[in-house]
Amino acid sequence: MHQSLTQQRSSDMSLPDSMGAFNRRKRNSIYVTVTLLIVSVLILTVGLAATTRTQNVTVGGYYPGVILGFGSFLGIIGSNLIENKRQMLVASIVFISFGVIAAFCCAIVDGVFAARHIDLKPLYANRCHYVPKTSQKEAEEVISSSTKNSPSTRVMRNLTQAAREVNCPHLSREFCTPRIRGNTCFCCDLYNCGNRVEITGGYYEYIDVSSCQDIIHLYHLLWSATILNIVGLFLGIITAAVLGGFKDMNPTLPALNCSVENTHPTVSYYAHPQVASYNTYYHSPPHLPPYSAYDFQHSGVFPSSPPSGLSDEPQSASPSPSYMWSSSAPPRYSPPYYPPFEKPPPYSP
């Protein structure tokens, strides 16, 4: 009976949708979705920091962080559900798929912009100048000196955004006087005297910064956002694959067969009855030896006979009277038989 229960349990546990396989798939899906959620938060944080670092450079790729984060959040909820698990995981896979596409696009845009449009050589050479924000009095002086009349209404609205004139020596020994707004890092080496054609293809001014060191931070943030988007791209593909394999699994408990086998032997009325071995062992009388000790003491009763191979006379069919048991001889000794669980009577001489 115990062997049959063990075999039935092992056959049930070998099913692909058993409880052990379900828990293992659930644990793996939760691990990958939590990891994707952490990466999504990093993408969102770094992307927002890169986007808000300057006013004229807004290419930080934080959109994949929002989409991947929402998809991974749905995946965590769906992995812990039983009834609506499939619907939640399908929605999670859809959002993660869109997030993977957005991460691919933002990784290309941020990487190309950081490599092609930001030149750090003038910054490292200290050839870029930071222009602080001008006060209202200085702005009025600049505007009045430039217009030589009372400032108009449009000019008065832009007092706090008044620009300063910065002299930048050009390659042809000429001087350019660009007008630069306050809180701006300006690089003369990247400015082409007002022409739209840039020398090295990089930005020559970065508006609304606290110092020129913010440009170096912006460069590092863009490359960090690019790397995180690439990580989110591959991790999103892996997460979608894991959730796709888990959405169709249901927990199934192993069914135990508790039927008890009949231990009593079946008796057939048309066949010879079989006697159990233990019955014959306990109830059959013990086998006696052919001769007892008393027989060997009175060996004269049985005369010796020559071997059968040395006798030339034919043996008679009927035994001789000398070989019969004498009536005056005592009976053969047979010890009394007691069952194994019965106590023998006390000894009496």
UniProtKB/Swiss-Prot annotation:
What are the record keywords, sorted? Membrane, Transmembrane, Transmembrane helix
Predominant location? membrane
Could you tell me which Pfam families the record lists for this protein?
Answer: FAM70
Region (Disordered) residue ranges read 303-329
Tell me the domain of life.
Eukaryota
Q: Low complexity bias located where?
A: 316-329
- The membrane spanning regions, by residue number, are 30-50, 57-77, 89-109, 226-246
Question: What are the GO cellular component annotations?
Answer: membrane
The residue range of the signal peptide is none
The GO annotation for biological process reads: response to bacterium
Q: Where in the cell is it found?
A: Membrane
Give the UniProt family note. Belongs to the TMEM255 family.
Q: What is this protein called?
A: Transmembrane protein 255A
Gene source species: Homo sapiens
